[in-house]
Amino acid sequence: AKVLTLDLYKKLRDKSTPSGFTLDDIIQNEHLGYVLTCPSNLGTXLRAXVHV
């Protein structure tokens, strides 16, 4: 998997999806905050996990 480096982010930032969303629209949500790759990180930048 590639890491989202600043250079890669700059290349992707101005591209849009067929629906017209940009990368910034997708990773930042006004209600949830910054949406990361893991659902346990939604809006907090903290990670919660349960190990059984």
Curated annotation (Swiss-Prot):
Chain coiled-coil ranges: none
PROSITE patterns the record matches: PHOSPHAGEN_KINASE, PHOSPHAGEN_KINASE_C, PHOSPHAGEN_KINASE_N
Residues engaged in binding ATP: R13, R47
Main location: cytoplasm
Keyword Nucleotide-binding in annotation: yes
UniProt xrefs under InterPro entries: ATP-guanido_PTrfase (IPR000749), ATP-guanido_PTrfase_AS (IPR022415), ATP-guanido_PTrfase_cat (IPR022414), ATP-guanido_PTrfase_N (IPR022413), ATP-guanido_PTrfase_N_sf (IPR036802), Gln_synth/guanido_kin_cat_dom (IPR014746)
Domain Phosphagen kinase N-terminal positions: 1-52
GO cellular component labels: basal plasma membrane; cytosol; extracellular space; mitochondrion
Catalytic activity: creatine + ATP = N-phosphocreatine + ADP + H(+)
Gene Ontology biological-process entries: phosphocreatine biosynthetic process
Pfam families xrefs: ATP-gua_Ptrans, ATP-gua_PtransN
Tissues in which the protein is found: Expressed in rectal gland, brain, skeletal muscle (at protein level).
Family of this protein: Belongs to the ATP:guanido phosphotransferase family.
Subunit structure comment from the entry: Dimer of identical or non-identical chains, which can be either B (brain type) or M (muscle type). With MM being the major form in skeletal muscle and myocardium, MB existing in myocardium, and BB existing in many tissues, especially brain.
Protein name: Creatine kinase B-type
Taxonomic path: Eukaryota, Metazoa, Chordata, Craniata, Vertebrata
